[in-house]
A protein has these predicted regions:
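N-terminal secretory signal peptides that target proteins for export/translocation
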Residues: 1-6
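Residue-level detector of intrinsically disordered/flexible regions characterized by low predicted structural confidence
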Residues: 8-11, 26
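Exported/periplasmic ABC-transporter solute-binding proteins
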Residues: 25-77, 84-87, 91-201
Length: 201
């Protein structure tokens, strides 16, 4: 577990959730398949129960990193709705003509936080005067910085702080934000960079 008392906001980083209808969903559909970013697991599971009860429609869900899901959809995966933690992957599918512009909505926001394993603390000043090598003595876990939204945002934040070249060798990059959260919960990384909504679990 991670403790909410060990959460610090990471400067200059946020995300936008983008929702798109991948294919036209029939008005009388018996089921709807939702592909959603792993960071939304709890929220979507709660909404799924409400939607199924109110509409008598089965909701099938698949969770992974936004990049993984986008590639699966491109390869023909049967998604009706795609909820991405990164607008770039929604753009990717839109450019492939798999999501129509008028079927897309950008909404919601999130922020990045630093987390530590339960029972451990971290005192850090998040500005350009701080030497991250003095603060981060162990591994730093986040999503893949090339493809997973949380990792891309983490890289952007560290770059803005002027820390990236010193942070990069310490990184453990994961397939999605939940995997990063679990690394920290098990004490395998000194800190993690995740979304505030994940840290609150």
């Amino acid at each position: 577990m991670v403790s909410d008392t060990k959460i610090k906001n990471l400067a200059f980083a946020c995300s936008v959730l983008s929702i798109g209808l991948v294919f036209n969903v029939p008005a009388k559909a018996e089921s709807v398949t939702v592909y959603a970013a792993a960071s939304l697991t709890n929220a979507i599971n709660d909404l799924e129960k409400i939607y199924e009860k109110q509409n008598k429609v089965e909701v099938k869900t698949s969770y992974a990193g936004s990049s993984t899901l986008a590639k699966q959809i491109e390869a023909g995966a049967p998604a009706d709705i795609f909820i991405s933690a990164d607008t770039q992957w929604m753009d990717y599918l839109q450019n492939k003509k798999l999501v129509a512009t008028n079927d897309r909505i950008n909404l919601l926001g999130n922020r990045l936080v630093l987390i530590t394993p339960k029972g451990q603390s971290l005192n850090i000043k998040l500005d350009k005067t701080t030497d991250p090598n003095r603060v981060f003595t162990g591994k730093i876990c986040t999503g893949d910085t090339k493809s997973v939204p949380v990792g891309k945002y983490a890289k952007q934040a560290f770059t803005n702080l002027g820390w990236w070249s010193r942070i990069e060798p310490k990184l453990v990059e994961t397939e999605d934000v939940r995997a990063a959260l679990n690394f920290v919960a098990r004490g395998e990384c000194q800190v993690g960079i995740v979304y505030a909504t994940d840290a609150a679990i």
